[in-house]
Amino acid sequence: MEWADKYRPKRIEDLIVSEEIRQKIQSWIDAWEEGSPKKRALILYGVQGSGKTSAAYAIAGTFGLPVVEMNASEQRNRESMKATALMASLYADLGASDFRKPSKVILIDEADNIFESNNPKRGGDTGGVYELSKIVKETRNPVIITMNDFYEFRKKNYSSEVINNSESIEFKPYARRLDRNYNEFKKNVRNRIKWIINQEGFSLPDDIINSIIDKNAPDIRSIINDVEAAAVSQSSISQNNDRDTVESVYYLVDKAFKKNYDDTLKSIYGSDVDSDYFINWVEENLPSKTDDISDLNSAYEQLSFADHILWAIERKRHFDLMTFPMEIAGGLAYYIENPKHEYVKFHSPSYINSMSRSKERRHALNAVSLKIGLLLHMSGVESLNYVWFYRLMFKVNAGFRDTVYERLNLTQGEEAVLES
């Protein structure tokens, strides 16, 4: 799991925001918990990367409620807003102990991009914001609305109904050295970053941390991504640790091809192997366990399902469900009716194929983008847009490739990312 997701704020106390913003959020939460909110919706607006969505999830964590998230794209037109958002916001869960209390937090992300079109072929109409205005007036559950461009949203029909019935909080970018809050922000971010690095067992010089913060502020997610890349690129995993990981996944793969599911689950729950790494190993070694076409088809369908679930978990950030894809892949033996009975030694996936879906490749790509960013005087996130250029140049100009390798001091994994 990437550090930015692993250490996402869980409560409003974890947010790195000004005390003014924190107090406004807390007042809105208190009003809900007292059962008498005058404004049932909360609008969080500000530039992209300012922490609005993270704040929404932290607010839900403070409530102790799950999040129902809707991204306001082309699929969020009038009918879908009416069928999904209105139902979710008006009615408590069937299993709720008290129907008068909120049961969830409704998150409508990027509301300034709510799709509105009179063209029925594109599935749109002009009532998306109107339906949203009804939701914020009538909801029985807290509604959080995020938007990048508050003033663009104000131009939409019925937007005033939404705004007037919502508490609005601006996530302002700091004016760097001219703003005393920026120094406080930088101090808090630096302390959080040092804590994360220590938790992960890495170390990083203060000058690199400060440089990363200055280049990415106020986008904390980008800061953490670049810090992770820098920390990993400066550290080496010992041969013993590599061996332990291989032995652990080898053991799990062996279990997956044996019909003792309870034993397999115990091994999965006691392992620290990543889900994508495990699935990659199982997929690579499946043909060695059966050559029956029907068996292979059934087994690969299950692996595809596990991979899809893994994608959904990462997309929705439900990381407490990370073992679910492994549970699916771990039962593969029950889809193989005609197994090979001879002993076969499992082998690891090919280097590039393994990296393409593993944490190792993500770390390598992050490390490369950070190094390119330092070379070009931009953030690692921005420099990702230029990786394709380096890949192309390496293919047509060996001299350029050798110079870049020397300047960036790339590891073998980082070279593989640029040559793939």
Curated annotation (Swiss-Prot):
Entry coiled-coil feature ranges: none
* Annotated disulfide bonds: none
Which controlled-vocabulary keywords does the entry list?
A: ATP-binding, DNA replication, Nucleotide-binding
Q: Which Gene3D superfamilies did the record assign? A: 1.10.8.60, P-loop containing nucleotide triphosphate hydrolases
Q: Which GO terms describe its molecular function?
A: ATP binding; ATP hydrolysis activity; DNA clamp loader activity
Residues involved in ATP binding: G46, V47, Q48, G49, S50, G51, K52, T53
The protein's matches in InterPro entries, at most eight in alphabetical order, are given as: AAA+_ATPase, ATPase_AAA_core, P-loop_NTPase, Rep_factor-C_lsu, RFC_lid
* Example of a GO biological process term: DNA replication
Pfam families annotated for this entry? AAA
Database matches in PANTHER family: CHROMOSOME TRANSMISSION FIDELITY FACTOR 18, REPLICATION FACTOR C SUBUNIT 1
Q: Which family does it belong to?
A: Belongs to the activator 1 small subunits family. RfcL subfamily.
Task: Describe its function.
Answer: Part of the RFC clamp loader complex which loads the PCNA sliding clamp onto DNA.
Q: What is this protein called?
A: Replication factor C large subunit
Q: Which organism is it from?
A: Thermoplasma volcanium (strain ATCC 51530 / DSM 4299 / JCM 9571 / NBRC 15438 / GSS1)
Gene for this chain: rfcL
